[in-house]
């Protein structure tokens, strides 16, 4: 049984433990889907009950993700795995050795010997194996392209992407005033500006000062505004 002091603490809210309502709000935040930041088209067509990859697949954007096998990508079918392994097993024949192929009864059906061209050795050793780019059985692990369930949303996203433009950066009033003082004192000597202990309080490098002056319009614009 709690004493009166503990009861007063619980009523006054001075305790450090979260209340029952606070615990409910914390559970709601954990179960709540993350906020989607982006275009309105993406927000309207995003299903919070699906995963991110499932939403991209529903919008027809999966092939643009360049999925890798260890990051939730699609795996190869067992037939392709066995076919590639059998090809690799048939291609590997050691020098001076041969592979004997028998039937179910144990009779010799065929003998596969190493190719003379593969047995040739150069003066610096055995030749390197063929490049992986020359092989036709190299898996890409890319998912199969799926049609978009909402082609209008995909067209709107493509239209937004085609109208993208670089963001113009502007110099703030305080930074412009600081650059005017630097140019008034050192003219165009950016090296002296970087070494000035009184004006260069933030220890900006020479390159950072040059970029700031270029963004503000150049030396001439700063001289005229002085």
UniProtKB/Swiss-Prot annotation:
Protein known as: Nucleolar protein 16
One cellular component term from this protein's GO annotations in UniProt: nucleolus
Membrane-spanning segments: none
Function statement: Involved in the biogenesis of the 60S ribosomal subunit.
Annotated source species: Mycosarcoma maydis (Corn smut fungus)
Keyword Ribonucleoprotein: yes
Swiss-Prot/TrEMBL keywords: Nucleus, Ribonucleoprotein, Ribosome biogenesis, rRNA processing
A biological process term (GO) from this entry: rRNA processing
PANTHER family attached to this UniProt entry: HSPC111 PROTEIN-RELATED (PTHR13243), NUCLEOLAR PROTEIN 16 (PTHR13243:SF1)
Record field: compositional bias (Basic residues): 1-11
Similarity comment: family membership: Belongs to the NOP16 family.
